[in-house]
Amino acid sequence: MWPLRFNNRFIAVLPCDPEVSLRSRQVLEAWSGVAPTPVPVPCLLAYSSEVAAILNFDAEELVTPRFVEVFSGNALYPGMQPYAVNYGGHQFGQWVGQLGDGRVITLGELLGADGVYYELQLKGAGPTPYSRGADGRAVLRSSIREFLCSEAMHHLGIPTTRALSLIATGDTVIRDMLYDGHPAPEPSAIVCRVAPSFVRFGTFELPASRGDIDLLRRLVEFTIMRDYPHLHGAGETLYVDWFAEICTRTAELVAHWMRVGFVHGVMNTDNMSILGLTIDYGPYGWIDNNDLDWTPNVTDAQSRRYRFGAQPQVAYWNLGCLARALAPLFSDAASLQAGLERFRATYLAAERRDAAAKLGFAACFDEDLELFDALRTCMHQAEMDMTLTFLGLADWEPNMPDSLSLWAEAFYDPVKRDAQAPMLRDWLQRYAARLSVDPLPVAERHERMRLANPRYVLRNYLTQQAIECAEQGDLIELHALLEVMRRPYDFQLGREAYAMRRPEWARSRIGCSMLSCSS
């Protein structure tokens, strides 16, 4: 591990805010130098051994006082140069201007064991010039959610930022969890999150909105140089290729979300990664009964802009915002349309690929998409758990005596189950007919479905149970969840409880079905 050699390319290349203070202000440059605010009693709650290994941390270092001091913001390793990044964004469809890292401080980059440079950020590290009067801290509940979901998504095979550590600060902050006029003290924590880049769509939108074409161009050139080094060429041709790849990655990302039933909850353009990573875990969730209109975010309860079924369309809209921000760099902005068309084509291809895999087909034809959509309709009307429905289907054979027995654990409402039983049996007959002409051998079909349909997903009620235990000083559930989510596609003996459908007590419970951006 030693010596750690930190690189700081973002701040070495891009212009710095000349003012050195925490005063909230409009910043015209790309970043501001700012140090983390120390915390009173830091305590390591959890860490990811896989991320630590990638970053070349020795296992012994992870439990030392020095590690805890650094990743709580109380100290720095040599070579770290902390800073906060400036960006803007569209939130819930409206341009809101400058946002920036209001409670995130980047420490620098480390060269990983895989040959990739990774940025290390502390989320909840204290105020910055972008905090807009807030305290720059993060509560324990949201920090646990980000830590666990970062790692769970990675092991599901979904592009994501990662998490190195979760550290309690020993302090409390005041938060109004549901924005309903009931603020209360909550314990705070800091997550060290890790990614090759945290550049967002909003990074480019802000200078474009201000007419600062020089900074816009410098940001684009830097991002291509650092994050897309495989792209070659110059000028508009290079920019077109770059934007098209962003569109491709974003389409693949959202297709993965739809495959596993993940709902991001707050797909603002400042929460969209330029690398096509899942970023900024807030009021996210996994759908239970396949309701395309469901969102876990109470802030979005009326418009449901970021509901599960709308995520592909929202991603496309966000890419349109990015295209408009980049347009000043082009003599003919129409060339960006090819990238947007790339998104459509990539998403449709990924949708077909994933439908075939989830149903166990060798390939997906048009009528297979109709069959897939029909199953989604059945799941919704019968109130069936999406994860358990596909899991049961992977073990089904046409000669089973009771065709619905495979879904015994998937139903949330026995009345709806009985009412929709004829429709479900009809669907299974259609499915059996399709399987009879598919070339995949049975064993290969089962394996294909197993790899596409997770057994374990990070259901909100599981996370909430871990949060409530951790708030009382019990970390057993936190560590158990972290371990289970490392192998989401495998049967894990003794871990069956983590694969169960949402219990009835969690249907309308805060933290389980209702979340907010309060963190």
From Swiss-Prot:
UniProt catalytic activity: L-seryl-[protein] + ATP = 3-O-(5'-adenylyl)-L-seryl-[protein] + diphosphate; L-threonyl-[protein] + ATP = 3-O-(5'-adenylyl)-L-threonyl-[protein] + diphosphate; L-tyrosyl-[protein] + ATP = O-(5'-adenylyl)-L-tyrosyl-[protein] + diphosphate; L-histidyl-[protein] + UTP = N(tele)-(5'-uridylyl)-L-histidyl-[protein] + diphosphate
Enzyme Commission number: 2.7.7.-, 2.7.7.108
Main enzyme class: transferase
A GO MF label: ATP binding
Keyword list, A-Z: ATP-binding, Magnesium, Manganese, Metal-binding, Nucleotide-binding, Nucleotidyltransferase, Transferase
Catalytic site positions: D270
InterPro entries per UniProt: SelO
Any Pfam family hit: SelO
HAMAP family cross-referenced by the UniProt entry: YdiU_SelO
Entry's family note: Belongs to the SELO family.
Listed name of the protein: Protein nucleotidyltransferase YdiU
Organism taxonomic ancestry: Bacteria, Pseudomonadati, Pseudomonadota, Gammaproteobacteria, Lysobacterales
